[in-house]
Amino acid sequence: MSKHTVLFELGCEELPPKSLKTLRDALQAETVKGLNEAGLDFASVEAYAAPRRLALKIVDVDAAQADTQKRFDGPAVQAAYDAEGKPTKALEGFMRGQGITVDQLSTFQAGKVEKVCYLKDVKGQSLDALLPQILQTALDNLPIAKRMRSAASRTEFVRPVKWVVLLKDDQVIEATIQDHKAGNVTYGHRFHAPEAVTLAHANDYLAALEKAYVVANFEKRQATIQEQVKKLADEVNATAIVPADLLDEVTSLVEWPVALRATFEERYLAVPQEALITTMQDNQKYFCLINAEGKLQPYFITVSNIESKDPTQIIEGNEKVVRPRLSDAEFFFLQDQKQPLASRKEKLANMVFQAQLGTLWDKSTRIAKLAVALSSITGANPADAEKAALLAKCDLTSELVGEFPELQGIAGTYYARIEGENTEVSEALGEQYLPKFAGDVLPKTKTGTTIALADRLDTLVGIFGIGQAPTGSKDPFALRRSAIGILRLIIENELDVTIEELVNLALQGYGDIVKDHDKTRADAVAFLEGRYRAKYEDQGVAVDVLQAVQALAPKSPLDFDKRVNAVNHFRTLPEAAALAAANKRVANILAKEAAPEGSVIEANLVEDAEKALFAELQAVTPVVEPLLAAKDYTAALSKLAALRAPIDAFFDGVMVMADDADLKANRLRLLAQLRNLFTAVADVSVLQG
């Protein structure tokens, strides 16, 4: 069967830049799905996207579907013919329905019954006949939140469609897609080459458009932007901040990227750089430049969509546009400094945190008391912790945070520094929100750790206390994410404290506001312990490893983490699978019949294998017990791995359920001693293979 290259392009008005890449990928996926469902073989489907177009190149696609046979089932052979071998009325009715004669019949075996059938040859449809509907269906299935209809068109799309190209090699496939007749004419850059571009062959697409100042390949366009931005940054000994989402958006805004470096007045560098970066990235789509120390430099890079004969005009235009935005940030910053942070508590007293839990000032005072209590656990200075907690939410009333909400905490840090607060206090104001997401950094200061922990605990316990725990997909206070943050703060700072102790401390701040302390405590502890799985699955830890540790229900997150790490390491040992299986066998035996009280009686050990296992246990126990006491669980399990050989020998040569009651009891005690050594770390019997 012959193979062809197909080009499809949908030309539109400017597509939403934040959706362009998603639309391209979805169009590719839906088309691949359609081709597969139609039974059309192909080598690849390449996808392209630029501001005014979505396109696909289907390489080496079949010219048509393969011919097939369709089976139509008739009556059973026994019911199809009479005693003389003539067709019965049932068979005649089947043949009449299919429009066939006796000589066109076949039979097939349906279980134990042989049945009559008709095998109809079905000729495969051509690519030309199938492709238009495949593409239209793909377009209909794109993830478009709000579709629009343009002019008299009956079809809807994310933006008005202007032209459609559909080529099979050098031939146009006759089709109407999105109410537009397909052809072989595309269009170049809106300003540099607005005239029509006729495509002679599907393979000419990318090259023809580049001659018309359009880079249709998204990745190539993006790589060009990255190269240009790096070159411009290198020229001033700086590094560009290039967030992935901003890079995607800028790539989606230009057909012919030309990066240009501009400047702004150095006086604006006195403003928190986070505010300047935010306004330049979010509002202007600029790439900001920083030096080796991470300090913002008085430059920015804009990516133009035209190759200007006078680029200085574009540069000056962007400098003129950005200046008012930087001036606004400067104004907010200076205005805020007229009112000390501590004096903002009156405004916090008028801002509701949660209707039943009070205002933000109520929350601040609770956090302050909790932070003082937590200081003995975190090692923070109680006075610093209390002061930082009382100042923590004050910047929420500032004009800078009002304009740039993402600067909450960060703005407070700047204002606290200006007011002369020490590093622990000022840094804690920004660190209180860390970690913000999975894998995010943690606070560097002890005070920051304390406030971050206190803030999360106060919210979690309070929300549980008023009966508004997360349900299903509803989690308005992001308690699931917050709980993982609490676990990380405890574990990664090596805080030796139980979850229940922390919940109790948080409950003290609520007093009578929380009516049922016992239920709140139980629910909050269970919720936090339930987040272990999400935390460790993000790290790639297997579920059975977690189950092995959870079987012991450790109370301390730090202790839980040490056990998880130990079991994770244990799984890598060559003895692990055999020891897990042996532990499972031991657990099953002891579940059926518990070991009698008392120690193993050495005189009742008669078999060489049980004597050897007992001797090994006696030797390893005094080595392992100090390791367990020191919570060095990894070393403890590594030592216990040496028991594999004597355990295997024991089960190969010893009958545990002996007829002699004394021998049986002694062997059960021996297995219980073995089991207790392993379960002092985790229940390794639940490990899979």
Curated annotation (Swiss-Prot):
Q: Give TM regions.
A: none
Q: What is its EC number?
A: 6.1.1.14
Q: Main location per UniProt?
A: cytoplasm
Which keywords does this chain's UniProt record carry?
Aminoacyl-tRNA synthetase, ATP-binding, Cytoplasm, Ligase, Nucleotide-binding, Protein biosynthesis
Q: Biological process GO terms, please?
A: arginyl-tRNA aminoacylation; glycyl-tRNA aminoacylation
Against InterPro entries, the record matches this protein to: DALR_anticod-bd, Gly-tRNA-synth_bsu, Gly-tRNA-synth_heterodimer
Tell whether Aminoacyl-tRNA synthetase is among the UniProt keywords: yes
Reaction catalysis annotation: tRNA(Gly) + glycine + ATP = glycyl-tRNA(Gly) + AMP + diphosphate
GO MF terms held by the record: arginine-tRNA ligase activity; ATP binding; glycine-tRNA ligase activity
Gene Ontology cellular component annotations, sorted alphabetically:
cytosol
Question: Where found in the cell?
Answer: Cytoplasm
**Which enzyme type, at the first EC level?**
ligase
Pfam families in the record: DALR_1 (PF05746), tRNA_synt_2f (PF02092)
Domain of life, source organism:
Bacteria
Question: According to its UniProt record, which protein family does this protein belong to?
Answer: Belongs to the class-II aminoacyl-tRNA synthetase family.
Q: Which HAMAP family match?
A: Gly_tRNA_synth_beta
Under the subunit heading, UniProt states: Tetramer of two alpha and two beta subunits.
Put simply, this protein is called Glycine--tRNA ligase beta subunit
